[in-house]
Amino acid sequence: MTNVYSLDGILVFGLLFVCTCAYFKKVPRLKTWLLSEKKGVWGVFYKAAVIGTRLHAAVAIACIVMAFYVLFIK
């Protein structure tokens, strides 16, 4: 279990948030409902989805490295 108030917890939360928003971008109903705004508070979801789709290789590698760290090292 990772604590959100530690650095590795924030990294895990950020990676999961980016991966989830990138998945939401692939689902048509969720894309129109959640990712329609590009500014403001709801724009964070859109920006995370753009990061997840444009940097999908780096995000995937970071998820694998973080999973290894959380499961075996921590």
Curated annotation (Swiss-Prot):
The keyword Lipid biosynthesis does not apply. Residues 74 are cytoplasmic. It is a single-pass type I membrane protein. Residues 23-52 are extracellular. GO terms for cellular component: Golgi membrane. Belongs to the KISH family. Involved in the early part of the secretory pathway. This is Protein kish-B. It comes from Bos taurus (Bovine).
